[in-house]
Regions:
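N-terminal localization/anchoring segments of enzymes in phospholipid and broader phosphate metabolism
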Residues: 1-302
Length: 302
């Protein structure tokens, strides 16, 4: 079951809300159907003995050292960065009061781990939840569920450009983005008590969109390890066309403007080459460029 909650009661947004709800439901259902047929992501508790032992050791040696549980004070608002988290409820005994903690999933850690010699992998969220007793050895696990926060990318320009250089402007803008309002909250639970708990803990607005299902962060499926796929299942890589001359791009665009078509044309032979020439040209005083987003190993950033 999937629950989609909207606090904003505005007739003008009804059509938009319905479209978002339908798309989200289709996305989750199609992934469940696809994974049921192909078994690309297997629950940790369904692994056979040898695979389960390897996964457990991988958790202890590679995953556990980078996890840091943080205590939650229910009387205070949680101001978390955009990302994926686990909320864990524990207690020492039945007579002991309940303790609430969250675990941030580091961005640098793989969301899916391929099992050696197998054509499937395990989810990092499932792996961590399966090993919570190892993390909280002196406490009993009551419940746990993941959630993902997405904050608005919009910032309001209140920067004094005359007093801050470009680097300081960027740093200040990025910090402001991390404090911007939460646009979307994905909750990996359909329990009303869990949804209510997060709604009380996080600084949500009336127009924050809340998704509740058994899955969160399906966008991370794009990072499924390639080794679990057979060659016939892998997408054919498109080779960009090299249409720009091998000579200087500076000389080429002196005669006329040129519109580059990506990814049809080679990005390396157009944009990257243009910036490299600009960096080496002694007549170029400065390079100013606005990037919406970059790849993990961006040549432009390098």
């Amino acid at each position: 079951p999937i629950e989609l909650t909207f606090d904003l009661d505005d007739d003008a947004l009804d059509e938009f809300k319905d479209a978002i709800a339908n798309f989200y439901q289709k996305m989750v259902k199609r992934w469940h159907k696809f994974n049921k047929n192909y078994q690309l992501v297997v629950p940790v508790d369904e692994l056979k003995k040898n695979s389960a032992k390897w996964v457990e050791q991988t958790f202890k040696s590679e995953v556990f050292p980078v996890l840091q549980p943080m205590n939650v004070d229910k009387s205070k608002t949680l101001n978390l960065h955009p990302g994926t988290y686990l909320l864990v409820r524990t207690r020492k005994s039945k007579s002991d009061s309940e303790k609430l903690q969250y675990i941030e999933i580091p961005k640098g850690i793989d969301r899916y781990i391929a099992v050696p010699g197998k054509k499937y992998c395990v989810s990092i969220l499932d792996l961590i939840q399966d090993n919570l007793e190892f993390m909280f050895k002196d406490r009993k696990i009551i419940s746990s569920f993941p959630f993902t926060i997405l904050r608005s990318a919009q910032v309001f320009d209140q920067i004094d450009r005359e007093q801050l250089d470009a680097y300081q402007q960027i740093v200040k803008t990025l910090k402001e983005r991390e404090r911007s309002w939460i646009t979307t909250l994905e909750i990996g639970s359909t329990e009303k008590s869990d949804i209510k708990l997060l709604r009380n803990l996080l600084p949500l607005r009336s127009d924050t969109i809340i998704f509740a299902s058994k899955e969160v962060g399906l966008a991370s499926l794009k990072s499924l390890p390639g080794e679990i796929f057979s060659d016939k299942d892998k997408c054919r890589k498109m080779k960009p066309v090299k249409t720009f001359p091998k000579s200087s791009i500076f000389e080429y665009i002196k005669s006329k403007d040129r519109l580059a078509f990506h990814p049809y044309e080679s990005y390396d032979q157009t944009m990257v080459k243009f910036l490299e020439e600009a960096a080496d040209d002694p007549n170029v005083v400065s390079i100013k460029i606005s990037l919406y987003r970059v790849a993990n190993n961006s040549k432009i950033v390098q």
